[in-house]
Amino acid sequence: MNFQSKFLTRSQSLKSLLCVGLDPDYCKLPEIIKRSPEPLVHFCREIIDATAPYAVAYKPNIAFFEVFGSSGIRQFEKVIGHLKNNYPQIPIVADIKRGDLDNTARQYARYYFGDLQVDSLTLSPYMGLDTLRPFLEYQDHLVFWLCLTSNPDSIQFQKKRFSETGRTLYEEVAYVANSISPLNLGFVVGATNTYELEILRKQNPDRIFLIPGFGAQGAKLDDLLPVCGRYSLINSSRGIHFASDGLDFAARANQEAEKIHNAMQARFVFL
């Protein structure tokens, strides 16, 4: 089953758009988890098992694993394996934000889509279309291009306007994506940009948006849901998995995910 089918089936079944991010920042892990031989695997498994009833997708962030070198990569692969073996119906978005020359990009695509078999990943568009094409060859998978991100300094580049076209950089990213038009290319649009999100959604009614920045970064569901549309994944990471740093961290993650799920479910029919 391709990414779009898995996403739509899961989203419509749960009547939700919740993507649970997995950012296992070691410094913030509960002490009992830090004593585990594989703390990142232990923590992520607990969070996954606690939130699976409410997750439309999971988004593990590679940076929190890479910091531990080869051990971290092995733990990342085990987390992916846990998801694929136990929750094959839930799509995986590998948050890697790569962007490199086509020959290098081909190696990334082979590892993440070929070997790990993640359903989707995030890429930077900065180096152009030739860095994207090796990923699009895996037609059952989906690529999320960074379009307009939620960090405050994104305006230094992403909202600058091209004199030749009158479009901003983020608008240019969307324009180029539409010029090649495959629907296995989606956009990352930060939750803190609700005005631009609404415009992008009207221009791209059928593209899937990955929307980070909800929860810990301050964006609110009441602002997002009226403008994002059903073809969206609204991500919450820290707000769910670091709801508690005590022994009840998994139970609290379950409660936070359920709370978001219920809020989305109540509004889903209006999306």
From Swiss-Prot:
Q: What is the protein's species of origin?
A: Leptospira borgpetersenii serovar Hardjo-bovis (strain L550)
A GO BP entry: 'de novo' UMP biosynthetic process
Q: What class of enzyme is it?
A: lyase
Q: Which family does it belong to?
A: Belongs to the OMP decarboxylase family. Type 2 subfamily.
Q: What is this protein called?
A: Orotidine 5'-phosphate decarboxylase
- HAMAP family, alphabetically? OMPdecase_type2
SMART domains the record matches: OMPdecase (SM00934)
What EC designation does it have?
4.1.1.23
Q: Which GO terms describe its molecular function?
A: orotidine-5'-phosphate decarboxylase activity
Which pathway features in its UniProt record? Pyrimidine metabolism; UMP biosynthesis via de novo pathway; UMP from orotate: step 2/2
Pfam families (UniProt xref): OMPdecase
Q: Which superkingdom does the taxonomy of this entry point to? A: Bacteria
- The record places the active site at 97 (proton donor)
The leader peptide range reads none
Q: Which reaction does it catalyse?
A: orotidine 5'-phosphate + H(+) = UMP + CO2
- Keywords per UniProt: Decarboxylase, Lyase, Pyrimidine biosynthesis
